[in-house]
């Protein structure tokens, strides 16, 4: 990373960006849930949320505190941010993929009629897990505003997709589940892309 990549840390500025993003993201999430509950039958909605909660709970500790360490140590070692993100991803994948397979098999044994929903719920949780590291790195690089935008992009894709399907009268849960996965993917790609742009092209991906 070049010495000019990123910006200096400013707690007040970063807190303002993150606060605005959180308020926007929570607002969009609430709108999304209202749309979802309006579009789906109560039992269908309940089962989808249950599947999501199972994987979210299983992955809750799988960030292993690594993004937190990245956000803490990154400002003092900015040239190590990109290699650190790749290391975090490799470590998380090593732990998360086996857990996803085990939890997925257990959930499928209880809900064998919805394999697609189980797969999507696992994918959404994995994508959210993968987003933590680049967002922490953006904050460490002094770009909390870009971290904030990545969150808003994720929620905007989700809420916009929900609204589109609701206006079309869609009552099946699968399209809404795919929209949630698309939002999670957008958040991950956006945060990773913004980090790459912030750090510049002069770092080489570690082998």
Where are these regions (language model features)?
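Signature of the first transmembrane helix
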Residues: 10-67
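Hydrophobic alpha-helical transmembrane segments
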Residues: 115-122, 149-199
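Membrane-interface junctions at transmembrane-helix termini in multi-pass inner-membrane proteins
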Residues: 73, 127-150
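Residue-level recognition of pore/gate-forming positions within transmembrane alpha-helices
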Residues: 22, 26, 53-56, 96, ...
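Helix-loop junctions and terminal segments of transmembrane helices
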Residues: 62-78
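Alpha-helical transmembrane segments of multi-pass membrane proteins
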Residues: 57, 61, 94-101, 105, ...
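Membrane-interface alpha-helices at helix entry/exit sites of multi-pass transporters
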Residues: 47, 79-91
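Hydrophobic faces of transmembrane alpha-helices in multi-pass small-molecule transporters and flippases
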Residues: 8-31, 89, 118-122, 145-149, ...
């Amino acid at each position: 990373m070049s010495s000019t990549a990123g910006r200096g840390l400013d707690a007040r500025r970063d807190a303002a960006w993150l606060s605005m993003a959180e308020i926007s993201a929570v607002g969009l999430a609430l709108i999304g849930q209202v749309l979802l509950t309006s579009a789906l039958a109560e039992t269908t909605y309940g089962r989808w949320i249950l599947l999501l909660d199972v994987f979210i709970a299983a992955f809750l500790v799988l960030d292993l505190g690594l993004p937190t360490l990245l956000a803490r140590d990154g400002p003092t070692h900015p040239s190590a941010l990109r290699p650190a993100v790749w290391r975090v991803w490799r470590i998380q994948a090593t732990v998360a993929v086996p857990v996803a397979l085990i939890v997925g098999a257990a959930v499928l044994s209880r809900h064998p009629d919805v394999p697609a929903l189980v797969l999507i719920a696992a994918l959404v949780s994995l994508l959210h897990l993968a987003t933590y590291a680049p967002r922490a790195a953006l904050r460490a690089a002094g770009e909390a505003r870009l971290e904030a935008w990545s969150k808003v992009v994720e929620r905007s894709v989700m809420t916009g997709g929900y609204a589109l399907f609701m206006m079309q009268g869609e009552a099946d849960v699968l399209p809404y589940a795919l929209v949630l996965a698309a939002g999670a993917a957008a958040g991950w790609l956006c945060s990773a892309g913004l980090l790459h742009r912030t750090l510049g092209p002069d770092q080489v991906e570690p082998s």
